[in-house]
Swiss-Prot record:
GO terms for biological process: cholesterol metabolic process. The chain crosses the membrane at residues 3-23. Residues 310-335 are annotated as: Disordered. It comes from Xenopus tropicalis. Residues 24-335 are lumenal. Disulfide bonds: none annotated. It is a single-pass type II membrane protein. It holds the Pfam family Band_7. Residues 310-321 have a biased composition (Polar residues). It is found in: Endoplasmic reticulum membrane. The lineage of its organism: Eukaryota, Metazoa, Chordata, Craniata, Vertebrata. InterPro entries: Band_7, Band_7/SPFH_dom_sf, Erlin1/2. This is Erlin-2. Gene3D superfamilies: Band 7 domain.
Length: 335
């Protein structure tokens, strides 16, 4: 009985071991590939639990999401013969799930060693071999990342379609200590030069600001002077216009006054011309004679009252006053 129990226990253990080896789990972001007898099977599996034939089938989980591969301590010889070392180069990449089978078949599940690590060494040495230390360490260092990315992706597009390089990050290389000190001194001098140049620019900027300020002040003074001059000109023009208006008004008044006097004189003359008729003049003459207390003697005295036309030709008689002695003498025929 004990022998049969032992056999049963062994059988249960074998079945449990078979089930344990048959059930496996694939994590999210991974693709499972299977090997049977060392041969890669065409079937792949996604995330979750899966079954496989125990003992004769094995699997590997291949990451298909974004991952970062680090390539460390990469030697690089420049065109000048200086050996430098890049401490760390990071390659960010991801694998398209549909391309997992082909890439694993051609480059195994550790495809990154062949397609990324070795390729980084090759491309970086190619870059260093055609550039000197100054270019690699300073002038072209900012281009190394992009150049490596483009070179890797170009080769992968033909060798392993489906493997995508997202980014490449390269650290500053280590150079010999003596050269590094020289570069530090050079950078220090360059920094001093830049500081001096910046100070010079600041001084020039301040001078330019002062010059512009002076120009603005001068323009301001000129504009104020121009405005004042314009005001004076306008005042003079206003005074001139006022004077012209006053002169015009005075001329108009004088002309109106002269016209009025002329009109009055003309009307007076017309009235006199109409008034001084021969009859009126005769009446005035009679009135003057009647009002005159003087006595005129002469042969033409009667004619004064008989012939008005002889008025201008009448000879003047001897004028005697009322109190003259001749008036008191008797006439010759009175005796």
């Amino acid at each position: 009985m004990s022998h049969a129990g032992a056999i049963a226990a062994i059988g249960v253990a074998l079945i449990a071991a078979a089930l344990f080896s048959a059930i496996h789990k694939i994590e999210e972001g991974h693709v499972g590939v299977y090997y049977r007898g060392g041969a890669l099977l065409t079937s792949t599996s996604g995330p979750g639990f899966h079954l496989m034939l125990p003992f004769i089938t094995s699997f590997k989980s291949v990451q298909s999401t974004m991952q970062t591969d680090e390539v460390k301590n990469v030697p690089c010889g420049t065109s000048g013969g200086v050996m430098i070392y890049f401490d760390r180069i990071e390659v960010v990449n991801y694998l398209i799930p549909s391309a997992v089978y082909d890439i694993v078949k051609n480059y195994t599940a550790d495809y990154d060693k062949t397609l990324i690590f070795n390729k980084i060494h090759h491309e970086l040495n190619q870059f260093c071999s055609v550039h000197n230390l100054q270019e690699v360490y300073i002038e072209l260092f900012d281009q190394i990342d992009e150049n490596l990315k483009l070179a890797l992706q170009k080769d992968l597009n033909s060798m392993a379609p489906g493997l995508v390089i997202q980014a490449v990050r390269v650290t500053k290389p280590n150079i010999p200590e003596a050269i590094r000190r020289n570069y530090e001194l050079m950078e220090s001098e360059k920094t001093k030069l830049l500081i001096a140049a910046q100070k010079q620019k600041v001084v020039e900027k301040e001078a330019e600001t002062e010059r512009k300020k002076a120009i603005i002040e001068a323009e301001k003074v000129a504009q104020v002077a121009e405005i004042k001059y314009g005001q004076k000109v306008m005042e003079k023009e206003t005074e001139k216009k006022i004077s012209e208006i006053e002169d015009s008004a005075f001329v108009a008044r004088e002309k109106a006054k002269a016209d009025a006097e002329y009109y009055t004189s003309q009307k007076t003359a017309d009235a006199n011309r109409l008034k001084l008729t021969p009859e009126y003049l005769q009446l005035v003459k009679y009135q003057a004679i009647a009002a005159n207390s003087k006595i005129y003697f002469g042969q033409d005295i009667p004619n004064m009252f008989m012939d008005s036309s002889a008025g201008p030709s009448v000879q003047s008689a001897t004028l005697l006053q009322d109190d003259s002695p001749a008036l008191n003498e008797p006439a010759v025929g009175d005796e």
